[in-house]
Protein backbone atom coordinates (compact mmCIF):
# COMPACT_ATOMS: atom_id res chain seq x y z
CA UNK A 1 0.00 0.00 0.00
CA UNK A 2 0.96 3.48 -0.66
CA UNK A 3 1.42 5.88 2.24
CA UNK A 4 -0.70 8.99 2.23
CA UNK A 5 1.23 12.15 1.36
CA UNK A 6 1.59 14.60 4.15
CA UNK A 7 1.45 18.28 3.66
CA UNK A 8 4.88 19.79 3.89
CA UNK A 9 5.39 22.93 5.86
CA UNK A 10 8.25 25.35 5.36
CA UNK A 11 9.61 27.52 8.08
CA UNK A 12 11.12 30.81 7.01
CA UNK A 13 13.06 32.87 9.50
CA UNK A 14 13.62 36.49 8.63
CA UNK A 15 15.90 38.87 10.43
CA UNK A 16 16.33 42.53 9.83
CA UNK A 17 19.09 44.84 10.83
CA UNK A 18 19.81 48.37 9.91
CA UNK A 19 23.00 49.72 8.41
CA UNK A 20 23.57 51.75 11.56
CA UNK A 21 23.45 48.64 13.76
CA UNK A 22 26.08 46.86 11.69
CA UNK A 23 28.38 49.82 11.33
CA UNK A 24 27.89 51.79 14.47
CA UNK A 25 30.50 54.37 15.32
CA UNK A 26 30.69 53.89 19.02
CA UNK A 27 33.63 55.28 20.90
CA UNK A 28 35.27 51.86 21.06
CA UNK A 29 35.36 51.31 17.30
CA UNK A 30 36.09 54.86 16.14
CA UNK A 31 39.20 56.53 17.47
CA UNK A 32 39.89 60.22 17.11
CA UNK A 33 43.20 61.66 18.24
CA UNK A 34 42.49 65.26 19.18
CA UNK A 35 45.94 65.74 20.65
CA UNK A 36 47.77 64.93 17.40
CA UNK A 37 47.16 68.39 15.97
CA UNK A 38 48.74 69.91 19.08
CA UNK A 39 52.04 68.12 18.49
CA UNK A 40 54.75 69.66 16.33
CA UNK A 41 54.45 66.97 13.61
CA UNK A 42 50.68 67.53 13.57
CA UNK A 43 51.14 71.27 13.27
CA UNK A 44 53.65 70.76 10.45
CA UNK A 45 51.21 68.54 8.54
CA UNK A 46 48.49 71.19 8.78
CA UNK A 47 51.01 73.82 7.66
CA UNK A 48 52.02 71.59 4.72
CA UNK A 49 48.38 71.31 3.68
CA UNK A 50 47.64 75.04 3.95
CA UNK A 51 50.88 76.21 2.34
CA UNK A 52 50.81 73.48 -0.31
CA UNK A 53 47.28 74.54 -1.23
CA UNK A 54 48.56 78.08 -1.67
CA UNK A 55 51.40 76.87 -3.91
CA UNK A 56 49.25 75.06 -6.40
CA UNK A 57 46.30 77.46 -6.37
CA UNK A 58 48.58 80.44 -7.00
CA UNK A 59 50.03 78.66 -10.02
CA UNK A 60 46.75 77.12 -11.22
CA UNK A 61 45.16 80.57 -11.35
CA UNK A 62 47.64 81.66 -14.01
CA UNK A 63 48.53 80.58 -17.53
CA UNK A 64 51.18 78.23 -16.16
CA UNK A 65 51.02 75.92 -19.18
CA UNK A 66 53.06 78.48 -21.14
CA UNK A 67 56.07 77.72 -18.92
CA UNK A 68 56.77 73.95 -18.94
CA UNK A 69 58.66 74.09 -15.64
CA UNK A 70 55.46 74.99 -13.81
CA UNK A 71 54.00 71.63 -14.88
CA UNK A 72 56.57 69.95 -12.63
CA UNK A 73 55.78 72.32 -9.77
CA UNK A 74 52.05 71.66 -10.18
CA UNK A 75 52.59 67.90 -10.23
CA UNK A 76 54.67 67.91 -7.04
CA UNK A 77 52.40 70.38 -5.25
CA UNK A 78 49.11 68.62 -6.05
CA UNK A 79 50.49 65.10 -5.60
CA UNK A 80 51.96 65.75 -2.17
CA UNK A 81 49.01 67.89 -1.12
CA UNK A 82 46.60 65.00 -1.74
CA UNK A 83 48.88 62.48 -0.01
CA UNK A 84 49.41 64.79 2.96
CA UNK A 85 45.64 65.16 3.41
CA UNK A 86 45.44 61.36 3.26
CA UNK A 87 48.13 60.99 5.93
CA UNK A 88 46.46 63.60 8.15
CA UNK A 89 43.24 61.58 8.04
CA UNK A 90 45.18 58.40 8.88
CA UNK A 91 46.86 60.07 11.87
CA UNK A 92 43.77 61.83 13.22
CA UNK A 93 41.58 58.72 12.99
CA UNK A 94 44.41 56.54 14.30
CA UNK A 95 43.98 54.14 11.38
CA UNK A 96 47.63 53.17 11.73
CA UNK A 97 46.73 51.35 14.98
CA UNK A 98 44.21 49.18 13.12
CA UNK A 99 46.65 48.19 10.38
CA UNK A 100 49.73 46.99 12.28
CA UNK A 101 51.07 45.06 9.26
CA UNK A 102 52.18 48.33 7.66
CA UNK A 103 55.50 49.70 8.98
CA UNK A 104 54.09 53.21 9.51
CA UNK A 105 57.32 54.75 10.77
CA UNK A 106 59.13 53.61 7.62
CA UNK A 107 56.25 54.75 5.41
CA UNK A 108 56.26 58.16 7.12
CA UNK A 109 60.01 58.51 6.73
CA UNK A 110 59.92 57.59 3.03
CA UNK A 111 56.95 59.86 2.38
CA UNK A 112 58.36 62.89 4.18
CA UNK A 113 61.86 62.35 2.80
CA UNK A 114 60.64 62.09 -0.78
CA UNK A 115 58.33 65.08 -0.28
CA UNK A 116 61.25 67.13 1.04
CA UNK A 117 63.53 66.26 -1.90
CA UNK A 118 60.91 66.69 -4.62
CA UNK A 119 59.44 69.85 -3.08
CA UNK A 120 62.94 71.32 -2.83
CA UNK A 121 63.48 70.64 -6.53
CA UNK A 122 60.05 72.08 -7.35
CA UNK A 123 60.71 75.19 -5.25
CA UNK A 124 64.04 75.77 -7.01
CA UNK A 125 62.40 75.25 -10.42
CA UNK A 126 59.57 77.57 -9.39
CA UNK A 127 61.93 80.31 -8.23
CA UNK A 128 64.16 80.04 -11.29
CA UNK A 129 61.16 80.21 -13.64
CA UNK A 130 59.79 83.44 -12.17
CA UNK A 131 60.73 86.42 -14.31
CA UNK A 132 58.95 89.77 -14.63
CA UNK A 133 60.01 89.95 -18.28
CA UNK A 134 58.46 86.60 -19.14
CA UNK A 135 54.89 87.37 -18.10
CA UNK A 136 54.38 90.43 -15.96
CA UNK A 137 50.68 89.65 -15.54
CA UNK A 138 51.43 86.40 -13.63
CA UNK A 139 54.65 87.54 -11.94
CA UNK A 140 53.18 88.19 -8.47
CA UNK A 141 51.35 84.86 -8.31
CA UNK A 142 54.41 82.94 -9.44
CA UNK A 143 56.69 84.78 -7.01
CA UNK A 144 54.30 84.11 -4.13
CA UNK A 145 54.03 80.43 -5.09
CA UNK A 146 57.81 80.21 -5.06
CA UNK A 147 57.95 81.69 -1.56
CA UNK A 148 55.29 79.30 -0.26
CA UNK A 149 56.99 76.35 -1.98
CA UNK A 150 60.13 77.01 0.06
CA UNK A 151 58.04 77.24 3.25
CA UNK A 152 56.40 73.89 2.47
CA UNK A 153 59.87 72.45 1.84
CA UNK A 154 60.94 73.57 5.31
CA UNK A 155 57.83 71.95 6.82
CA UNK A 156 58.55 68.65 5.04
CA UNK A 157 62.17 68.85 6.22
CA UNK A 158 60.93 69.19 9.80
CA UNK A 159 58.58 66.25 9.44
CA UNK A 160 61.37 64.22 7.83
CA UNK A 161 63.46 64.86 10.93
CA UNK A 162 60.65 63.77 13.28
CA UNK A 163 59.94 60.73 11.11
CA UNK A 164 63.61 59.79 11.20
CA UNK A 165 63.70 60.06 15.01
CA UNK A 166 60.57 57.87 15.27
CA UNK A 167 61.94 55.36 12.75
CA UNK A 168 65.31 55.19 14.49
CA UNK A 169 63.79 54.64 17.93
CA UNK A 170 61.53 51.96 16.46
CA UNK A 171 64.40 50.06 14.81
CA UNK A 172 66.59 50.19 17.93
CA UNK A 173 63.94 48.40 20.03
From Swiss-Prot:
The keyword Transmembrane helix applies. Keywords: Chemotaxis, Cytokine, Cytoplasm, Membrane, Nucleus, Transmembrane, Transmembrane helix. GO terms for biological process: chemotaxis; myelination. One of its GO terms (cellular component) is extracellular space. The keyword Nucleus applies. Residues 36-168 form the MARVEL domain. The chain crosses the membrane at residues 40-60, 70-90, 105-125, 147-167. Highly expressed in liver and pancreas. One of its GO terms (molecular function) is structural constituent of myelin sheath. InterPro entries: MAL (IPR013295), Marvel (IPR008253), MARVEL-CKLF_proteins (IPR050578). It comes from the Eukaryota. Belongs to the chemokine-like factor family. This is CKLF-like MARVEL transmembrane domain-containing protein 8. It comes from Homo sapiens (Human). The gene is CMTM8.
Amino acid sequence: MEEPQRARSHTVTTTASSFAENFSTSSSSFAYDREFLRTLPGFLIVAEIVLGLLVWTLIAGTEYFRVPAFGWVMFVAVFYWVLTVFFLIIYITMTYTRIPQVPWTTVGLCFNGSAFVLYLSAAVVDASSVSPERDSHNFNSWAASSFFAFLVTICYAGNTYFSFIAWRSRTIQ
